[in-house]
Amino acid sequence: GGEILFIESSLSEGKGNLSITGNLGKIMKESAVIALEYIKSNYQDLGINKEIDYSKYNIHIHVPEGATPKDGPSAGITILTSLVSLFTQKRVKKNIAMTGEITLRGKVLPVGGIKEKILAAKRAGMKEVILCHENEKHVVEIPTDYIKDIQFHYVREMSEVLQLALN
């Protein structure tokens, strides 16, 4: 779609539950599960404390504006970035937008609606946008004058996303 979504995540003592709220569809919920599994498999590379016992914490992912239904794989890299930020306490840069599907191995896959998403990012004042390298062909369809103030980053792996997005 053509609107910016914000992703919030929190950690609390609990029993290892993953809660996902914000009127999300099945595919978007699956993206959250994939993101958490990726973190559990790659915690060392991500700089996450190996002592974390996930069974003693509840993780809550929320996408505000719950009245609006949301679905699709496009928020995968954003959900994963939010969770890595939560576990490492590294802040996500301001004025950065991202979209892309993730795999369990951390690959970033292309998504649809790129033109609409970039126009929404521009309206929201974003200065940087992270996309799958396969979506670059969709960016060239947008008039250069309109997006000249946005820096685009084309990635293949989640490690690249995290390097670009986290302070």
Task: Give residue spans per PLM region.
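Peripheral, non-AAA+ core regions of ATP-driven protein-machinery
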Residues: 3-167
